[in-house]
Amino acid sequence: YGVGRITKEQESISGDNYSVLCENGQFVFCLSDGMGSGIEANRESETVVELFEQFLRAGFPRIMAARMINSMLLLQPKEGMFSTFDVASINLYTGVCSFLKGGASPTFLRRDTWVEVVESTSLAAGLVSQTDFDTTTKKLYDGDYLVMMTDGVLDALPGDRTEQMKQLLLEVKNSEPREFARELLER
């Protein structure tokens, strides 16, 4: 896998965090974007990804872990604490990828000469007590690129942001994941 990061102008700390877990034939990537930007947003999203990883290691199913994190965010004394929640879990034997999204930006699946979009209509974790996270599955194949991002990346694009990102993804030439991510952010 490869990761590219960038912060908002005049910000030294990003409000985004991620976690990667690979065990029992599953590769799980969790991405969270805390409310706002800077250190407070960073702490919020860091809490989300760390708790999610701990719940998975303890044997909780992904959806249950997400619901417990949502409840925890609702119980925080600081009003208005919420974070997006974006999980892709790939079965390394079958190639089936399960998505779980809460208020998250679209995820893009690039395959050869086309790009598919996995979108979410649910709210971010910590906003309401009965959050219904969006779930779906897709089959991945050798050579596919799964691209997850927070809203800041899309917000930097003009016009129809989703269509712009699809076009940018098709233009990236690097095949190594880290270089792919770097090239995408440089565009």
Language-model segments: residues:
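Extended hydrophobic-aromatic, low-complexity segments
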Residues: 40-41, 98, 108-110, 116-119, ...
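Short hydrophobic-aromatic micro-motifs
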Residues: 27-30, 99-100, 146-149
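Acidic loop->beta-strand submotif enriched in PP2C/PPM serine/threonine phosphatases
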Residues: 12-24, 85, 117-160
